[in-house]
C-alpha cells in the first residue's frame, strides 16, 4: 500500500466516482481504476460496492478512508515541517 494509492482512493471517495477523481487528479480513468484494483487486491477486500448509480463504500472502505485521511494529513504536515526545518540556517559561533 502506497501513499499515492491512498491519495487516489480518497479522491474517489471525496468526488464520488472514479471519473470525478481522475479529473481532480488530472489523470485518465484507466490508470486510476487499475490502482484501485491493485489496492483492493493487496488488502484482499472490496473497498466499494458498485451500484447502478456509482460506488458506495463498504465497511472496509469506510475504515480505510478514515485511516487514509489521517495518514495523508500526517504525511503532508510532516513534509511541511521537514521542509521548513531544512530552510532554517544554523549560525555557528566559535
Label for each model-derived stretch:
Residues 8-12, 64:
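Short alpha-helical "packing" element that flanks the helix-turn-helix/winged-helix DNA-binding module
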Residues 12-28:
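Short helix-boundary/capping micro-motifs
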Residues 17-18, 36, 50:
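Helix-turn-helix DNA-binding elements, focusing on the entry/boundary residues of the two helices
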Residues 24-25, 36, 43, 64:
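Core residues of bacterial helix-turn-helix
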Residues 40-57:
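A short LG(V/I)-centered, amphipathic sequence patch enriched
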Residues 83-94:
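Interdomain hinge and pocket-entrance segments immediately C-terminal to HTH DNA-binding domains
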